[in-house]
Amino acid sequence: MSFEEGADLNASHCCREWLAAVLGNTHVRWGWFVEETLVKVERFPAHQPLSWPQQTELWLAPVGSAPLPPASPWVHQLELSQVPLRDPYPGLGLDRALALWAAGIHYGWPCLVIDAGTALTLTGADSEGSLVGGAILPGLGLQAQALADHTALLPKVQWDPQDPLPPRWANDTVAAIRSGILHTLLAGLREFIADWRRRFPQGPLLLTGGDGKWLHPHLGPLDPELRWDPHLVLRGIAGCRQLHRTARHSPSAE
């Protein structure tokens, strides 16, 4: 599978068009940009063989086990040290840093990002753009997979963003698994959000990640500043690229 097949866009040698890629554990997300505008996003299974574009500027955020493309002068691999988030701790996930920094520069500081992917993470920064801290827990799919893998009789439950919230007191096994995972997850997130608001009464809250679309309508009534942005990490990559290009063309760099 190649990105061009899904995007129907041609590679450009003039650097107006370029590609960002987030290499995760379960998926690879490609974002095609024209200058700073995100025009197309595609998602592929992480270990599916991919045909990477040739002679196209490519910025990578390796955040999981997906294989890297071949090295070339066109490929730029980001590291945590290149994200201008203040006071990150060693080992902070690159995707968490990119999403938080993008949230801050696009929506304002202080901010809290809830990334509902394979792992669900909460990451916050204060009004100065300094990391406050966060939390990591298994995402919806990983919790369901753990029950199926480590019990003899429980089935694996699939999620659909269109599914309504199940009844809390379920009367069959599948509904009981859904209830247990979803209601306890929402209760925990509400408590984290309430604690964040005690510390930072103002500022945006951002949901991103594959399960964020499902979480948004269930958490949105809790806080009017909660927004859903599925492309925060890609926006963070774009911001880092812009900083790199600005620094390279500044008088001090000549």
Swiss-Prot record:
GO cellular component: cytoplasm
Domain of life: Bacteria
Cofactor(s), names only, from the UniProt record: NH4(+); K(+)
Main location: cytoplasm
E.C. number: 2.7.1.33
Biological processes per GO annotation: coenzyme A biosynthetic process
Annotated HAMAP family: Pantothen_kinase_3 (MF_01274)
Family to which the UniProt record says this protein belongs: Belongs to the type III pantothenate kinase family.
Protein name: Type III pantothenate kinase
